[in-house]
């Protein structure tokens, strides 16, 4: 990650160049990020402002994962990474519970195998 993030502007709370060095990087399932960031990433500016960090998302080819790159001061980027990973896990568990409830409901209705 030796290059600067491709953005039109860098938020005022991010100090250039020191906060752009050594970003926190992690991967999250793309469907979970859509739940976190809203349609078309509409919540990203708000999350950046509240967390005092800058986010960059990179879709990984041949995978359902997206790489999340977090820039900012040391504590802010660690806190933002933890927050986003926690939110992704919460959404994953919520979707999993929904699928289990759906399976239970289908079993309760005794739907034939052609309906499953």
From Swiss-Prot:
Keywords recorded for this protein, A-Z: Cytoplasm, Developmental protein, RNA-binding
Domain KH: 23-84
Function, as annotated: Involved in the maintenance of embryonic stem (ES) cell pluripotency. Dispensable for self-renewal of pluripotent ES cells and establishment of germ cells. Associates with specific target mRNAs.
Native source species: Homo sapiens
Biological process (GO), any one: regulation of gene expression
Compartments, as annotated in UniProt: Cytoplasm
PANTHER family documented for this protein: DEVELOPMENT PLURPOTENCY-ASSOCIATED PROTEIN 1/5 FAMILY MEMBER, DEVELOPMENTAL PLURIPOTENCY-ASSOCIATED 5 PROTEIN
Coiled-coil regions listed in the entry: none
Entry's family note: Belongs to the KHDC1 family.
UniProt superkingdom: Eukaryota
Induction of synthesis: Down-regulated in differentiated embryonic stem (ESC) cells, compared with strong expression in undifferentiated ESC cells.
Name of the molecule in the record: Developmental pluripotency-associated 5 protein
Keyword RNA-binding: yes
GO CC annotations, alphabetized: cytoplasm
InterPro entries according to UniProt: KH_dom_type_1_sf (IPR036612), MOEP19_KH-like (IPR031952)
Pfam families registered for this protein in UniProt: MOEP19
UniProt GO molecular function: mRNA binding
């Amino acid at each position: 990650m030796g290059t600067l993030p491709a953005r039109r502007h860098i938020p005022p709370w991010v100090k250039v160049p020191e906060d752009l060095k050594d970003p926190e990087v992690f991967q999250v399932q793309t469907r979970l990020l859509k739940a976190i960031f809203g349609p078309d990433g509409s919540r990203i500016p708000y999350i950046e402002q509240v967390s005092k960090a800058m986010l960059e998302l990179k879709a990984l080819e041949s995978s359902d994962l997206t790489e999340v790159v977090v820039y900012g001061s040391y504590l802010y980027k660690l806190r933002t990474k933890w927050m986003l990973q926690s939110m992704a896990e919460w959404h994953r568990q919520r979707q999993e519970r929904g699928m289990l409830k759906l399976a239970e409901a289908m079993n309760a209705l005794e739907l034939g195998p052609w309906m499953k």
